[in-house]
From Swiss-Prot:
Catalysed conversion reaction: a 1,2-diacyl-sn-glycero-3-phosphocholine + H2O = a 1-acyl-sn-glycero-3-phosphocholine + a fatty acid + H(+)
Annotated Gene Ontology cellular component terms: extracellular region
Keywords carried by this UniProt record: Calcium, Disulfide bond, Hydrolase, Lipid degradation, Lipid metabolism, Metal-binding, Myotoxin, Secreted, Toxin
Name used for this protein in its record: Basic phospholipase A2 BjIV
GO process terms (BP): lipid catabolic process
Cofactor(s) listed in the protein's UniProt record: Ca(2+)
UniProt-annotated location(s): Secreted
Regulation of its function: Inhibited by crotapotin.
Co-factor: note: Binds 1 Ca(2+) ion per subunit.
Enzyme Commission code(s) on record: 3.1.1.4
Functional note: Snake venom phospholipase A2 has a high enzymatic activity and produces moderate myonecrosis in skeletal muscle, but shows no neuromuscular activity in mouse phrenic nerve-diaphragm preparations. PLA2 catalyzes the calcium-dependent hydrolysis of the 2-acyl groups in 3-sn-phosphoglycerides.
Top-level class of the enzyme under EC nomenclature: hydrolase
Taxonomic classification: Eukaryota, Metazoa, Chordata, Craniata, Vertebrata
Amino acid sequence: DLWSWGQMIQETGLLPSYTTY
């Protein structure tokens, strides 16, 4: 799901804007 992307992105720090998901 998209929420997983927010978690992974937050960890990687590639796209902080995606943390909203």
